[in-house]
Curated annotation (Swiss-Prot):
It comes from Pseudomonas phage Pf1 (Bacteriophage Pf1). This is 10.1 kDa protein.
Amino acid sequence: MEESGIVGFTVTGAVEKVTDFRTAPFCSQAVFAQMLGLEDITEDVVRGWVETKTIPTAKIGRRRVVNLHRIRRDLDRGKSIFCQGDYDGD
């Protein structure tokens, strides 16, 4: 996984760095905290959301990453509040 925490895959399956966050499918917890840009949202806060299944995640290798695609899809469908256990079945 790239140091930036954000990667994408080409049609052939090769890893490529994603520079446009609007289309990135996944990101690391640290990058997600940075993307939110709020002082109160630290990497520890995001880790808490992951552990309580408040935000969707995916396991890639040994890392648990934030599933940005699922967040965008849920927001498009009208979801506006994310609560503990929302993604318990994932």
